[in-house]
Design a protein with these regions (language model features):
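Sequence context of c-type cytochrome heme-c attachment sites
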Residues: 99-112, 130, 141, 146
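Sequence/structural segment immediately N-terminal to covalent heme-attachment motifs in c-type
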Residues: 109-134, 148-150, 157-162, 194-223, ...
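Extracytoplasmic electron-transfer domains, predominantly the class I c-type cytochrome c fold
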Residues: 137, 143-193, 217, 221-224, ...
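Glycine-rich, flexible loop/turn motifs
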Residues: 18, 25, 29, 138, ...
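Periplasmic c-type cytochrome electron-transfer domains
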Residues: 2-108, 149-155, 170-187, 268-283
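Short, solvent-exposed mixed-charge patches
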Residues: 289-290
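Basic, gly/Ser/Thr/Pro-rich low-complexity segments located predominantly at protein N termini
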Residues: 39, 53, 122, 135-138, ...
Length: 290
């Protein structure tokens, strides 16, 4: 229990304490904090009050106090964006004045286009074509050298600008299920390099008219966007049942309700000509550009 002693009865005379003593020894001292600590304390609440008044701080029903500086994160963002746009402006002007082919010849502009094109690709293209052009099922890989419509910088720019919507005929009404099965097997073997002995498959491939688009050698035709059947690159699936479905119902064949629907949208009205050039250069430099 505490005992309170008067000034005359303080058992520790000369010591700055409150006079409260516990267990004849424990007492409450009255040492003041150092001046530097008190200055820090007062400086902290003064700074807090100034910050409170200068910046947005108090939420209201439909708004908030603005602060006498009228600062907002959006105004800071716009100022930073304006600053970086001034840095980019000389590059953007040069890109606008040159063709994509000429930009590729200029290392500085090419590097700039690839860096900014990567951002554009992530915002607009990666959802279908995957990060860094790795592809997804139904969407072409852009990092290899297998191109449906050509891998030159001009062809890539053309594909981005106008989009692509290739068509493959449906053969369900022309071929029997057995013929479709045999043809699918032939295409599988062709991709694996083991089709040479399949004379019946070759006959079907020719008589059904497949050679008209894919060529007698099966290597496709970039003017038509027809696939190369002799490599191991599959836009959709290499499973036999999926190949049979494509042969039977085609791709984007409007009169067949079971056709595989696939289309690349045109970006000519969504992106500026400069952005399309940068995107084309980024895709071209992923590794498969011609």
């Amino acid at each position: 229990m505490s005992e309170q002693h008067g000034a005359q009865g303080n058992p520790f005379p000369g010591e700055p304490n409150t006079g409260h003593v516990w267990d004849n020894n424990l007492r409450e001292l009255t040492n003041p904090p150092p001046k530097w600590w008190m200055w820090g304390l007062h400086a902290s609440w003064i700074f807090t009050l100034a910050y409170f008044l200068a910046y947005p701080s108090i939420p209201l029903l439909s708004s908030h106090t603005k602060g006498f500086l009228h600062w907002t994160s959006m105004s800071e963002y716009r100022a930073d964006l304006k600053e970086i746009e001034q840095v980019r402006l000389p590059y953007e002007k040069r890109i606008a004045a040159l063709s994509a082919t000429d930009i590729l010849k200029d290392k500085e502009l090419s590097d700039y286009s690839q860096r900014t094109g990567k951002v554009l690709f992530g915002d607009n293209c990666a959802a279908c074509h995957g990060a860094n052009g790795a592809g997804n099922v139904g969407f072409p890989v852009l990092a290899d050298d297998d191109w449906l419509y050509g891998g030159t910088i001009d062809k890539i720019q053309e594909s981005i600008t106008g989009g692509r919507s290739g068509v493959m005929l449906a053969f369900a009404q022309q071929l029997s299920p057995q013929d479709i099965d045999r043809l699918a097997q032939y295409v599988l073997e062709w991709s694996a390099g083991t089709q040479a002995a399949d004379t019946e498959g070759k006959r079907l491939f020719t008589s059904a008219g497949c050679v008209g688009c894919h060529g007698a050698d099966g290597k496709g035709n970039q003017l038509m966007g027809s696939a190369n059947l002799t490599d191991k690159v599959w836009r959709f699936s290499h499973e036999k049942e999926d190949i049979k479905r494509i042969i039977a119902h085609g791709v984007n064949f409007v009169t067949d309700p079971e056709t595989r629907r696939t289309q690349m949208p045109a970006w000519g009205q969504r992106l500026s000509a400069t952005d399309i050039k940068k995107l084309a250069i980024f895709v071209h430099e992923l590794g498969g550009g011609k």
